[in-house]
Amino acid sequence: MSSSDSIRMVLIGPPGAGKGTQAPNLVERFHAAHLATGDMLRSQISKGTELGLQAKKIMDQGGLVSDDIMVNMIKDELTNNPACKNGFILDGFPRTIPQAEKLDNMLKERGTPLEKAVELKIDDELLVARITGRLIHPASGRSYHKLFNPPKEDMKDDVTGEPLVQRSDDNEDALKKRLGAYHDQTEPIVDFYKKTGIWADVDASQPPETVWSAILKALGKN
């Protein structure tokens, strides 16, 4: 890898694997930008940029935003977002081989090729237990877990005593469908990065601090 405190990587992992915990750690440690494709899309649309307007038109018609628009959005961030000076953590992209190839070509043209693709791996059954047990206090956003972090009183917020709710998309069948789709989509991407020699996997079933150490080790930064 290049200079000791820059980073150019893709973060891969299913819902609930801890990307939301680890991405901020990476941002803080490397002063790099966390480029989550959903956030980027929303930002470009709200700013009314040309790319944002193109994307909005497609989305309003129920279509999927093209690979070219997504790659150009990433290029735009790399060019105009000062936080990208020390590198980037791409999250949610690429999801297909053509996307991975287009991304690679664009990054190589800029002279900033990817250095690592880190996959957070976790057993589906464990993920389902993790996610379906999540309980939320809607007003404050405080979250609990039936198994790992239960409230003092069943289904009640510790601070206010108000009822807790379970997110509707956190139910088991919906989650298993999402995980099935995730694996179908991700396996070819993992193979692609294995072939290019930049892939590394991390066991995401461990406690967050252990996962963090393993990510740094995978990046050669421990």
UniProtKB/Swiss-Prot annotation:
<dbReference type="GO" id="GO:0036388">
    <property type="term" value="P:pre-replicative complex assembly"/>
</dbReference>
<comment type="subunit">
    <text>Monomer.</text>
</comment>
<keyword id="KW-0547">Nucleotide-binding</keyword>
<comment type="similarity">
    <text>Belongs to the adenylate kinase family. AK2 subfamily.</text>
</comment>
<dbReference type="GO" id="GO:0016208">
    <property type="term" value="F:AMP binding"/>
</dbReference>
<dbReference type="InterPro" id="IPR006259">
    <property type="entry name" value="Adenyl_kin_sub"/>
</dbReference>
<feature type="binding site">
    <location>
        <position position="178"/>
    </location>
    <ligand>
        <name>AMP</name>
    </ligand>
</feature>
<dbReference type="InterPro" id="IPR000850">
    <property type="entry name" value="Adenylat/UMP-CMP_kin"/>
</dbReference>
<dbReference type="GO" id="GO:0046034">
    <property type="term" value="P:ATP metabolic process"/>
</dbReference>
<dbReference type="Pfam" id="PF05191">
    <property type="entry name" value="ADK_lid"/>
</dbReference>
<protein>
    <recommendedName>
        <fullName>Adenylate kinase</fullName>
        <ecNumber>2.7.4.3</ecNumber>
    </recommendedName>
</protein>
<dbReference type="InterPro" id="IPR033690">
    <property type="entry name" value="Adenylat_kinase_CS"/>
</dbReference>
<keyword id="KW-0496">Mitochondrion</keyword>
<dbReference type="GO" id="GO:0005829">
    <property type="term" value="C:cytosol"/>
</dbReference>
<dbReference type="GO" id="GO:0006172">
    <property type="term" value="P:ADP biosynthetic process"/>
</dbReference>
<dbReference type="InterPro" id="IPR007862">
    <property type="entry name" value="Adenylate_kinase_lid-dom"/>
</dbReference>
<feature type="binding site">
    <location>
        <position position="167"/>
    </location>
    <ligand>
        <name>AMP</name>
    </ligand>
</feature>
<dbReference type="GO" id="GO:0003688">
    <property type="term" value="F:DNA replication origin binding"/>
</dbReference>
<dbReference type="InterPro" id="IPR028587">
    <property type="entry name" value="AK2"/>
</dbReference>
<feature type="region of interest" description="NMP">
    <location>
        <begin position="36"/>
        <end position="65"/>
    </location>
</feature>
<dbReference type="GO" id="GO:0004017">
    <property type="term" value="F:adenylate kinase activity"/>
</dbReference>
<feature type="binding site">
    <location>
        <begin position="16"/>
        <end position="21"/>
    </location>
    <ligand>
        <name>ATP</name>
    </ligand>
</feature>
<feature type="binding site">
    <location>
        <begin position="63"/>
        <end position="65"/>
    </location>
    <ligand>
        <name>AMP</name>
    </ligand>
</feature>
<dbReference type="GO" id="GO:0005758">
    <property type="term" value="C:mitochondrial intermembrane space"/>
</dbReference>
<feature type="binding site">
    <location>
        <position position="42"/>
    </location>
    <ligand>
        <name>AMP</name>
    </ligand>
</feature>
<feature type="binding site">
    <location>
        <begin position="143"/>
        <end position="144"/>
    </location>
    <ligand>
        <name>ATP</name>
    </ligand>
</feature>
<feature type="region of interest" description="LID">
    <location>
        <begin position="133"/>
        <end position="170"/>
    </location>
</feature>
<comment type="function">
    <text>Catalyzes the reversible transfer of the terminal phosphate group between ATP and AMP. Plays an important role in cellular energy homeostasis and in adenine nucleotide metabolism. Adenylate kinase activity is critical for regulation of the phosphate utilization and the AMP de novo biosynthesis pathways.</text>
</comment>
<feature type="binding site">
    <location>
        <begin position="92"/>
        <end position="95"/>
    </location>
    <ligand>
        <name>AMP</name>
    </ligand>
</feature>
<feature type="binding site">
    <location>
        <position position="37"/>
    </location>
    <ligand>
        <name>AMP</name>
    </ligand>
</feature>
<feature type="binding site">
    <location>
        <position position="206"/>
    </location>
    <ligand>
        <name>ATP</name>
    </ligand>
</feature>
<dbReference type="GO" id="GO:0005524">
    <property type="term" value="F:ATP binding"/>
</dbReference>
<keyword id="KW-0067">ATP-binding</keyword>
<dbReference type="GO" id="GO:0046033">
    <property type="term" value="P:AMP metabolic process"/>
</dbReference>
<dbReference type="InterPro" id="IPR027417">
    <property type="entry name" value="P-loop_NTPase"/>
</dbReference>
<feature type="binding site">
    <location>
        <position position="134"/>
    </location>
    <ligand>
        <name>ATP</name>
    </ligand>
</feature>
<feature type="binding site">
    <location>
        <position position="99"/>
    </location>
    <ligand>
        <name>AMP</name>
    </ligand>
</feature>
<keyword id="KW-0808">Transferase</keyword>
<dbReference type="Pfam" id="PF00406">
    <property type="entry name" value="ADK"/>
</dbReference>
<dbReference type="GO" id="GO:0006270">
    <property type="term" value="P:DNA replication initiation"/>
</dbReference>
<keyword id="KW-0963">Cytoplasm</keyword>
<keyword id="KW-0418">Kinase</keyword>
